Regions:
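N-terminal pre-catalytic "stem/leader" segment of glycosyltransferase-like enzymes
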Residues: 1-100, 335, 411, 417-423
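Conserved donor-binding/catalytic core segment of Leloir-type glycosyltransferases
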Residues: 163-185, 191-196, 204-205
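Nucleotide-activated donor-binding/catalytic signature segment of Leloir-type glycosyltransferases, i.e.
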Residues: 217-239
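Short alpha-helical donor nucleotide-sugar binding micro-motif in glycosyltransferases
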Residues: 246-251
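Aromatic "clamp/platform" in nucleotide-sugar-dependent glycosyltransferases that forms part
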Residues: 259
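Short hydrophobic beta-strand element within catalytic cores of glycosyltransferases
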Residues: 270, 276-282
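A charged, aromatic-enriched C-terminal amphipathic alpha-helix characteristic of glycosyltransferases
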Residues: 312-370
Length: 423
C-alpha cells in the first residue's frame, strides 16, 4: 500500500523515490521467499460461483493433450483485479497452471498489490501481466519475479466494429466525458473549466455508468446546478456500447479528467470512433505514448479551459482511427501477445504449435471476431474451437473448499459487485 500511495501522490520527487526503492527492495525479498509469498497468497476462500467470472475469464488457447496428459499448455485470460483474485482463491491453481499459461489484465494501476503479487507464489510457471502504465511495467521488471509484464492493456482491445466513425454526424457537443459517478473521475475539474470559459454556448455530453458502490452521483449533479451549468451539460446514463459510439461521434473531443486509474478504455474507444482524446500529462495508468499528433493532446491541469476551446475550433485536424487500427486494434494486440507467449514458451522449453485467438473488451471479454448473428455471447467459439467455458473451468478446477464455501458466498457477491472496477 505504501508503494502504491507514493507512486500516486509524488511519483518524481527524490524523497519519494528513496522510499519507493526501500519498499521495492522489501518486496523483492518477499517475492524471492516462498514463506513471504505464502503469507501474501493466504486468503479466505470464497464460493466458486460461475456468475462471478463470466465476462472476466476467457480461454484464448486450448491445451493440447496426448490421451490424459497435457503436452502443450493453453492460455487463460483473467480480467479485473478483484475477479482474478477471486479466481486464484477459488481454484486449484497448481492444476490450472499445469494446463494453462495465465494472462492477467488488472483493472487498476499500482501493481504493488497483494492481489497481483500473490500470483508470484506459483514458482514453477510464469504469469503474464498486462502493464500499460510504464511505472507498473518497470516495477514488475525490477521485481525480477515470475510476473512477466507486457506493455498492453484495456486500451488495446477496443472493438473497432462497435466504435467507429458514423456518416456525417452532427457535432452537437464541444466535448464528451465518459465517467462513472465516482470522485476519482474528477468531474469538478470540467465544471470549473466551463465556469471559467463562461460561454453558455459551449456544450458537453456527460456519459455515465451507474455502478453499485459509486455514491457521488447526487453530489456531481448538485455541483452542475450550483455552477448553473444544467443547460450546457447533457447527461446520458447506462448506454449500450453502440449508443456510446453515437454520442462520441457527436463530440469534438473526448476528455479524461482523472489523475490515476487503470488503463482506461473510453479514451481509446473515442480514437476508434474518430474522436481525439484529451488527458493530463501526469496521469498514472493510461499509456501516454498512445497520444500522438493524430490522436489528441496531453496537457497540464491548468491548461484545461484553453485546451477545450482549442478542440472546439480545431478538432478536424485530428484523425485518430487510422493510428488506432494500425497500433491497438484487437488483431494487432493479439499478435503482440501471441509473440510474447511464444517466446515465453521457448524460454521454458515448452512446445508452441497453436497460436491464441483474438479477443476484445465490450466491456467484458468477448472473442473477436465473434459470431455475427450472436455478437453478445461471451462464450461463442471462433472458428469452431471448442474452448472451455467458465462453467467448465469452475467444474474442473474449483477447490473442494470453494465448492462448499457458503458462509462467504453472500459476502463475496456483495464485495465483488461493489468493489470491482467494470473495465
Amino acid at each position: 500500500m505504501s508503494h502504491r500511495i507514493l507512486m500516486r501522490v509524488s511519483p518524481r520527487t527524490g524523497f519519494s523515490d528513496r522510499l519507493k526503492q526501500r519498499i521495492e527492495r522489501n518486496l523483492i525479498r518477499a517475492c524471492a521467499s516462498d514463506e513471504g509469498m505464502a503469507s501474501v497468497a493466504a486468503n479466505a476462500v470464497p464460493r466458486a460461483a460461475p456468475w462471478l467470472f463470466r465476462k472476466f475469464v476467457l480461454v484464448l488457447k486450448a491445451p493440447r493433450c496426448d490421451g490424459d496428459r497435457v503436452v502443450e499448455r493453453g492460455v487463460l485470460l483473467l480480467k479485473n483485479t478483484e475477479r482474478l483474485d477471486f479466481f486464484r482463491r477459488c481454484m486449484s491453481m497448481a492444476s490450472v497452471l499445469k494446463d494453462y499459461t495465465l494472462v492477467l489484465e488488472p483493472s487498476w494501476s499500482g501493481y504493488a498489490n497483494p492481489k497481483l503479487l500473490a500470483f508470484d507464489s506459483y514458482r514453477d510457471r510464469p504469469v503474464v501481466v498486462m502493464s500499460p502504465c510504464r511505472a507498473d511495467y518497470e516495477f514488475l521488471e525490477r521485481l525480477n519475479s515470475r510476473l512477466r509484464p507486457i506493455s498492453i492493456g484495456a486500451s488495446d482491445w477496443v472493438d473497432p466494429r462497435v466504435f467507429r466513425p458514423l456518416a456525417s454526424p452532427d457535432k452537437r457537443f464541444d466535448a464528451v466525458v465518459i465517467a462513472r459517478w465516482n470522485w476519482v473521475k474528477r468531474h469538478h475539474l470540467l465544471l470549473r473549466a466551463l465556469r471559467r470559459i463562461a460561454d453558455p454556448s459551449y456544450r458537453v455530453a456527460l456519459v455515465s455508468l451507474n455502478v453499485k458502490g459509486d455514491q457521488d452521483r447526487s453530489a456531481i449533479l448538485s455541483l452542475i446546478d450550483r455552477y448553473d451549468l444544467a443547460r450546457q451539460v447533457t447527461v446520458f446514463e447506462d448506454l449500450v456500447p453502440a449508443r456510446v459510439n453515437e454520442i462520441l461521434n457527436q463530440a469534438k473531443v473526448n476528455v479524461l479528467l482523472s489523475r490515476q486509474e487503470g488503463s482506461n478504455r473510453s479514451l481509446f474507444e473515442g480514437f476508434f470512433a474518430g474522436v481525439p482524446g484529451l488527458a493530463f500529462a501526469n496521469h498514472i495508468g493510461i499509456p501516454l505514448d498512445h497520444f500522438t499528433t493524430q490522436t489528441g493532446r496531453l496537457i497540464a491541469q491548468d491548461e484545461l479551459p484553453d485546451a477545450l476551446l482549442y478542440f472546439r475550433e480545431h478538432w478536424a485536424k485530428f484523425d485518430p482511427r487510422p493510428w488506432a487500427m494500425a497500433n491497438i486494434a484487437p488483431e494487432v494486440t493479439t499478435a503482440r501477445l501471441n509473440l510474447f507467449l511464444r517466446q515465453l514458451a521457448r524460454e521454458s522449453a515448452e512446445p508452441w504449435t497453436q497460436d491464441i485467438v483474438a479477443k476484445c473488451n465490450r466491456p467484458g471479454l468477448y472473442y473477436y471476431p465473434d459470431a455475427p448473428d450472436e455478437p453478445d455471447r461471451p462464450d461463442n467459439k471462433p472458428d469452431g474451437h471448442g474452448f472451455a467455458t467458465v462453467d467448465d473451468l469452475v467444474s474442473r478446477y474449483a477447490t473442494i473448499s470453494a465448492r462448499s464455501s457458503k458462509a462467504n458466498s453472500s459476502r463475496t457477491r456483495r464485495s465483488s459487485r461493489s468493489g470491482a472496477v467494470p473495465d
